[in-house]
Every structure is written in C-alpha cells, then in structure tokens.
Swiss-Prot record:
It comes from Bacillus subtilis (strain 168). It comes from the Bacteria. This is Uncharacterized protein YqaS. The gene is yqaS. InterPro entries: XtmA-like_N.
Length: 239
C-alpha cells in the first residue's frame, strides 16, 4: 500500500490545496505542511492551481509612497523575522529548537505526543517497580550527624526502611493517577481528532490495555489491604 504522504504529494504537485489534501487523507493541515517540509515537496512548474486559490501582489498599494520599497514581511535583522523572536533572549538554544519544531504540530498532534509519552511511562514503571521478593527490604541512610560529648565524638545515623509491600502500594497509587491522566488525554484526542485519523486504531489498543491494567491494579490493591486479627477472650480456664 502506498504511503499517504506519497499519494498526497502527487495531488500536491497537481496543485491541490492544503485544506483539500487534509480532508482527503484524514489528517490536519499542519500534518500536510509537515510532510511538505520533511519530504521536500515541490510543485511542478506550470502546475495549475486548483480553483479557489487566491494570489495577491506583495508590497505597497499603487501610488502609496509611504511604503515605497517595502516588499512585505519583517525588515532584515528584525527579531520578528526569527521564529523564536522575543524568547531568544531568555531561553536556551535547545528549548528554542523544540519550540520551532512545535510550530509544525497541531493541537491534536501535541495531545497525541503526550498520550505516547504517558503510555510509555506507565509501561516503564511496571518494569522498574516490579517486586520479585515479597520479603525484600531497602535500607536507606536518611540522616547522619556528629554529636560531641564530654569525652568523645559520636556519629548518629538515621535509616529509613522500606518494605516491598510499601513500594508496591506507592507504585499502585502512582499508576492509578498516571492512568487517570492518560484517560483524560485520550478523551481530548477523541474530541479533536478527525473521524478517519489512523491513530484512532492505536488509541483503541492503548485504551484496552489501560482498562486491563486498571482491573489488575484494583485486584492487587484488594489483595494488599491489611488483614485484621481479632482476639477473643475465652475467660479463665479455671472456671
């Protein structure tokens, strides 16, 4: 099957507009623009523009001497001509580079990015927090200080002990919050994305996995609840 961007390029080369391409291939206009930049799309010379394309002369209106010589856009050297403009004074180059890349992303694309990041974090957390030994205990130095007495110097150390079930409970709570956030992102994507967006299939797969993990967490939480011991006083055996 021919990739969408290849087929879209053929239509673009014939003169089809961004909006029409987006509707035809079920993607956003920003995605079409991103394809154009990434794959170096060029229209063939003399390719007819589709009906409705409007072109206008750039520059000052005829007879207007106040704007004489101005071809439009920001003057050379003007910071407005730089994508990051104002922010270039205050933000590091790496951040500015990310901001430039974001210009090509639509709100739907950005939500999709967040969904993938959140989903990956949930899966990774499963591996990091996996407890193989229920009796496992972590001993961690919390505080250390020296105390002077009349005769000598004594070092005091304070340790924090964390048992496997404590770590497991913390992990389950964190996973529940992460999955709630992911479900919220999925809901936003559903509301904004095009009905034929191909990412919806991947989203459905994620949703099924998240629901499955939610059930697993609920079951594990139920198992990890503290049990209660009731002592019944039977009285003195001498009676």
């Amino acid at each position: 099957m021919v990739d969408k961007h290849i087929q879209a390029y053929k239509d673009y080369a014939k003169g089809m507009k961004y909006k029409d391409l987006a509707e035809k291939y079920g993607v956003s206009v920003n995605t079409i623009k991103s394809w154009k930049q990434r794959h170096g799309w060029q229209r063939k010379k003399g390719a007819p523009l589709k009906k409705g394309v409007h072109t206008k002369k750039v520059g000052a209106p005829l007879g207007n001497k106040n704007a004489l010589g101005n071809n439009g856009g920001a003057p050379k050297g003007n910071q407005n001509a730089v994508t990051h403009g104002f922010f270039s004074k205050f933000l590091p180059e790496e951040t500015l580079s990310i901001m430039e890349g974001i210009q090509e992303r639509s709100p739907v694309d950005m939500i999709w990015d967040q969904i993938q990041i959140q989903y990956a974090a949930i899966i990774r957390a499963q591996k990091i927090m996996f407890v193989s030994d229920k009796q496992e205990m972590i001993k961690e130095l919390k505080k250390k200080k020296s105390v002077l007495s009349e005769t000598n110097e004594v070092e005091e150390e304070e340790f924090e002990f964390q048992f496997s079930w404590d770590r497991h409970a913390t992990f389950l709570n964190a996973q529940s919050r992460a999955m709630a956030e992911l479900r919220n992102l999925i809901k936003q994507f559903d509301e904004l994305a095009h009905s034929e967006d191909e990412r919806r299939l991947k989203l459905e797969h994620m949703r099924l996995n998240i629901n499955k993990k939610k059930i697993e967490i609920e079951e594990l939480t139920e198992e990890d609840k503290p049990f209660e011991i009731t002592i019944v006083n039977k009285g003195d055996d001498s009676d």
